[in-house]
């Protein structure tokens, strides 16, 4: 088993290319740099999905290289088997099942982490790191009562220790299908405001349930609400056309932002 050199990958399993990407900073005016720390938190990732753990039907050379240069674990546990609570546990160090409102969050949920809570990002900032969250967020945004995507959104990731955020508010299969950068929806036209609802349909955009002939991906397991880019999502939305992402570009955009 090797010692960690520059990067420590953490791969518990739940859906994103995101986490905390902390640029090394010089401390106290000295020339020595702190090691970079990158958390990669992925949904639906099993031990058999990585070639460094024996997968034969897929090749994961970049992850394999990280494993080869760092520490590779063969026994690990997650605080939850689902998205929102596992992220909550990672950032706060608390068991999500002992906290309220830590179930799978809708895309218009309020921020579920108390801004008074000391998070992993706070601790890294105190240690002299610049911190960033890039990719899937799924911990809610905004105050109690839900998120208004048409103005500066606060509290957000920057309210709990991150210097920078470029995030998907919930998941790629949930509305709103937009990116949020430092509390603002990227590319939003103020004359075309976003409305999001998880209880009933809003607006007149077609849905997978009502218009199955318009979908390129067959709806299933609740993924039959508003259609975005031919894909029926969970939840309903209308507005914000100029801000909608293109699904085929998500990985490239997220990777570009993470590198920055």
Briefly describe each language-model feature range.
Residues 2-5, 12-15, 20-260:
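Formylglycine-dependent sulfatase
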């Amino acid at each position: 088993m090797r010692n960690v050199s520059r990067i420590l990958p953490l791969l518990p399993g739940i859906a994103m290319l995101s986490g905390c990407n902390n640029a090394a900073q010089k401390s106290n005016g000295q020339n020595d740099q702190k090691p970079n720390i990158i958390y990669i938190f992925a949904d639906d990732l099993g031990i058999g999905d990585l070639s460094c753990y024996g997968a034969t039907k897929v090749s994961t050379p970049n992850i394999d290289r990280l494993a080869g240069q760092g520490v590779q674990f063969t026994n690990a546990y997650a605080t939850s088997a689902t998205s929102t609570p596992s992220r909550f546990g990672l950032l706060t160090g608390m068991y999500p099942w002992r906290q309220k409102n830590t179930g799978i969050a809708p895309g218009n949920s309020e921020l579920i982490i108390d801004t008074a809570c000391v998070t992993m990002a706070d601790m890294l900032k105190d240690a002299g790191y610049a911190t960033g969250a890039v990719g899937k967020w799924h911990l809610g945004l905004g105050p109690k009562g839900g998120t208004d995507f048409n103005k500066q959104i606060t509290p957000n990731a920057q309210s709990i220790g991150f210097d920078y955020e470029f995030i998907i508010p919930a998941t790629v299969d949930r509305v709103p299908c937009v990116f949020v950068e430092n509390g603002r929806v990227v590319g939003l036209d103020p004359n075309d405001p976003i409305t999001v609802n998880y209880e009933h349909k809003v607006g007149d955009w077609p849905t997978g349930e009502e218009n199955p002939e318009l979908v390129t991906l067959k709806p299933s397991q609740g993924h039959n609400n508003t259609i975005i880019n031919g894909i029926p999502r969970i939840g309903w939305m209308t507005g914000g056309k100029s801000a909608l992402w293109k699904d085929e570009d998500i990985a490239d955009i997220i990777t570009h932002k993470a590198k920055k």
